[in-house]
Swiss-Prot record:
GO biological process, one term: proteolysis
Protein name (Swiss-Prot/TrEMBL): Carboxypeptidase Y homolog ARB_07161
Record-linked PANTHER family: SERINE CARBOXYPEPTIDASE CTSA-4.1, SERINE PROTEASE FAMILY S10 SERINE CARBOXYPEPTIDASE
Reactions that this protein is recorded to catalyse: Release of a C-terminal amino acid with broad specificity
GO molecular function: serine-type carboxypeptidase activity
Enzyme Commission designation: 3.4.16.5
GO cellular component, one term: extracellular region
Disulfide linkage: C281-C305, C288-C298, C327-C334
InterPro entries named in the record: AB_hydrolase_fold (IPR029058), Peptidase_S10 (IPR001563), Ser_caboxypep_ser_AS (IPR018202)
Pfam families reported for this sequence: Peptidase_S10 (PF00450)
Major subcellular location class: secreted
Protein family according to the UniProt entry: Belongs to the peptidase S10 family.
Glycosylation (residues): N111, N430
Length: 486
């Protein structure tokens, strides 16, 4: 089995009624962990507002089961959950899946077989939306991809209609076929997570990363049980941004100050101040690593590092997602197309065609991102999970060379710092130029060893398939074919 890098993000929720309209939160409504987190936030962030960190559930209207083409109950599936090398009850009986066949002619996204629906966590009231597209080539043999967006708090529908899906949305809200869609040679599942992102919903928002894996495990178990025709192919998990999760803060000063391949954005005094803040930032992060359950410690560290190493760049007006230009549209994360996608998906005929139960779609949720920050999730050492993954799964980590927030210097650094048997050989290897397999132009630089590969993609920002669609499809297909995996 091969796999692209991703960390799974889904949160916890409480019991949920069939329909819900949100109301404002007050401090007296917070209990347990939420109250602990809010106390930590107030202590570290003067003037913090409750609504910035704890959002009510997304408004929704659940459709009756008979409106769906089918459903599958978890209790009909016999499986185990493996945790720390031990078999444990999977809890799959707590889940169910509702689905429908999407008529390709209804929206014109693509003419391939499509399914959409919801994974339902009956115990916690989570409902995660998915949209599946069959491969354009040979779905019987082509691999299956699970795509997860980052943020945290951005819908995978944004990547579907902006980057690697079968169609792109224009300013006029019309669709154009994407000739460089990743479903040219693979079937793709786009999953909206965590809860209250995109078309997913639940009574309580997501707070951190670790609660994700069981929900995604349940989704995949039920999906492949219901659609066994896709269960025998190679399977990959792919994602971007926060899906990769960890970027060393020490990489920000050199990237902003002319050492990442592009001209400096900041002046020398600011660069020196940022460099001077790196040791303290690293100390704060280590404190969080040493006490990962201490929310106040992790929040304090994340705030210090963000204030010292990210805000100086943000204040310039330059896009944190592409060092080559200004932020065109701050309300849509510097990408105007995100606003077009939201308008397209908020059309009633679109929502009806895919069975969406959330009437107001937002591409990215600042509330979700703030919640993850508030729970200290930003500084958690999840990259330490990668060595265990490398025992069984090949991992490709790619980064656009013009991205600031997840810059290639930092991504390369953490791949070289991983504690795994191939570390020393991987570190010693130099980056070598990769050429497009057909057009023969240089698309990036790569290094790889024993199942781990790092790829620096030329002339690309944060969203690589958006900036370099041909090159992204080329390296994606080559990875699927087994290149860079020895």
């Amino acid at each position: 089995m091969k796999g692209l890098l991703s960390l799974l993000l889904v949160g916890a929720a409480n019991a949920l009624a069939a329909s819900y309209e949100p109301r404002s939160l007050t401090e007296d409504m917070l209990q347990g962990k939420e109250k602990e987190v809010w106390d930590a936030i107030k202590g570290e962030i003067p003037g913090a507002q409750l609504d910035d960190y704890f959002n009510p559930p997304t408004a929704h209207q659940r459709e009756p089961d008979e409106k769906w083409d089918g459903k599958l109950e978890g209790k009909s599936v016999n499986t185990l959950w493996v945790e720390e090398g031990k078999d444990k009850p999977s809890g799959i009986e707590e889940y169910g899946m509702r689905f429908k066949t999407v008529d390709p002619s209804s929206l014109g996204v693509d003419n391939v077989t499509q399914y959409s629906g919801y994974l339902d966590n009956k115990k916690n009231g989570q409902h995660l939306f998915f949209w599946f597209f069959e491969s354009r080539r040979d779905p019987q043999y082509d691999p299956v991809i699970l795509w997860l967006n980052g943020g945290p708090g951005c819908s995978s529908m944004t990547s579907l209609f902006m980057e690697l899906g079968p169609a792109r949305v224009g300013q006029d809200l019309k669709l154009t076929r994407n000739p460089n869609s990743w479903n040219n040679r693979a079937s793709i599942i786009f999953l909206d997570q965590p809860v209250n992102v995109g078309f997913s919903y639940g009574k309580s928002g997501a707070f951190n990363t670790p609660s994700a894996s069981k929900d995604v495990f349940a989704f995949l178990t039920l999906f492949f049980k219901k659609f066994p025709q896709y269960a025998l192919q190679d399977f990959h998990i792919a994602g971007e941004s926060y899906a990769g999760h960890y970027i060393p803060f020490a990489s920000y000063p050199p990237m902003a100050c002319g050492k990442g391949g592009y001209s400096a954005v900041l002046d020398q005094p600011t660069c020196k101040a940022m460099e001077a803040a790196v040791p303290q930032c690293q100390k704060e992060i280590k404190r969080c690593y040493d006490k990962p359950t201490d929310v106040a410690t992790c929040v304090k560290g994340a705030k210090f590092c963000k204030d010292a190493l990210v805000r100086p760049y943000s204040r310039t007006g330059q896009s944190i997602y592409d060092i080559r230009g200004r932020c065109e549209d701050p309300k849509d994360l510097c990408y105007p197309i995100l606003g077009w996608i939201a308008k397209y998906l908020n059309q009633r005929h679109v929502q009806k065609a895919i069975g969406a139960e959330v009437s107001h779609f937002k591409g990215c949720s600042n509330h979700i991102s703030s919640q993850f920050f508030a729970h200290g999730d930003y500084n958690q050492p999840f990259h330490r999970k990668i060595p265990g993954i490398l025992k069984d799964v090949n991992v490709l980590v790619y980064a656009g060379d013009a991205d600031y927030i997840c810059n290639w210097l930092g991504v390369k650094e953490w791949t070289e710092a991983l504690q795994w048997p191939g570390r020393h050989i991987f570190r010693r290897k130099n980056l070598s130029v990769v050429y497009h397999s057909v057009n023969k132009w240089p698309l990036g630089r790569v290094k790889y060893h024993n199942g781990l590969a790092f790829l620096q993609v030329f002339k690309a920002g944060h969203r690589v398939p958006y900036d370099q669609p041909e090159n992204a499809l080329d390296f994606f297909n080559r990875w699927l074919a087994g290149e860079w995996t020895p």
